[in-house]
């Protein structure tokens, strides 16, 4: 629901606009995926494989917008230019060959998939329209693994894949939920090709220590990016939709130039004092995201660091606990000159305990603290406390009936930041208030 009120004064004349909108979105998706592989040894330590992959995805979206004019008593009216009934079918066939061979401490894998894909879109309302795209892609892959010894190894992996545009990205209906930031889809979008390269080093010791270091890079050709323009005067879009001066319209387009770099360090070791394991990690991600703003291509750079510590313990088969803390340090900077840098930190601390006591009774409790720094005063820190009480029964305690209570303190919130071509959007949403659920669980062993 959107309630909109506007008053403009121009040349001594005041014009008032007032209306309410209700949007009904009904979306359905069906998918099917299968994979067949045959492997045949050809010589010692060398194997040849052949595979066939099939996937099918059907998506339907019925998006209707109803509007009532606050200045009249006409009731709700269906707005055709803001409504759409759209269906997409994405079908892929891929045949591939692969070669695998082992040589002392080395293991090599090399392969390629030859993929044919079709994307069909059909709009049946408000006007009939169809699109059809066919694609042929060669998607190579490779892996090299070198083992220094049984507990010490390197692995280099390369993969490529394709991604089809979503139904929401293809629907050309205009969304004016926020009249200052209009958005629409683009039925002419093409598929996106992804290339991923990862290097991993793993070390484990007899004393239970583990060290993992990872480096990664991702390149996306035909990345589905935002193209945004700002109206320099009041204009009317196709379909009769009004766009005020200073408002902006964003639509998706395919752009090359997206890349991201990832790194992660993890160190784990046992802590005998409380019969637990400690895991320390640091992850980092840098992404350069292409956009178009007022016809000029630019890049938004996003940098994220996530330090994390986890202490997990299995004191016995009846009692365990986990303590953890992580901080997500976020920085975003656009190449658009007038856009300021966005910096904020999200802190998450969590304590979890599970206890099975007298006569198969179980008690579980999780308390999570989420805090923010660098954001507006409207974003509040909060605690989320969930707990459950259950009873195990039947042979080997295979069954359990349980009462779960969620958000006992009633403080849960939802927050998300999105980075646009020339803006940062901080989104908060209402979440389900405290509730309880009774469940029955049966474990098959």
Language model regions located:
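Primarily recognizes Gram-negative and organellar outer-membrane beta-barrels
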Residues: 1-445
